[in-house]
Amino acid sequence: MICTNPDLVVDRGEKREFCAGSIAKVFEEIGGKVNYFGKPYPLVYNQAADVKGKKVLCIGDNLNTDIRGANLQNFSSLLILNGIHKNEADYSYEKLFEKYNVSVNYVQTILKW
């Protein structure tokens, strides 16, 4: 199996749904082999890493994938707080980052296009 989005869940509006990573996880648990692509795996960052003289900022709402991937590549990160971890608001930022063993450079409440 090829899993192009390792996230376990995704928020679509006000609804939280299982994501491709959940299917891949179950497939592995029953003995299947999964090749993962996407954050936090390095292949997705190759193009950004090859840009000389530029700074990279990884933006995402998932500490396990978006921010962990940035940390693994030594890129700066921006966590969007109204995403996957919004229900963990009882944590201070520092405790939340410690819980997931990540380092976050910047936080922002919401991201709109």
Regions found by a protein language model. Give the residues of each.
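Asp-based, Mg2+/Mn2+-dependent phosphohydrolase catalytic module
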Residues: 1-113
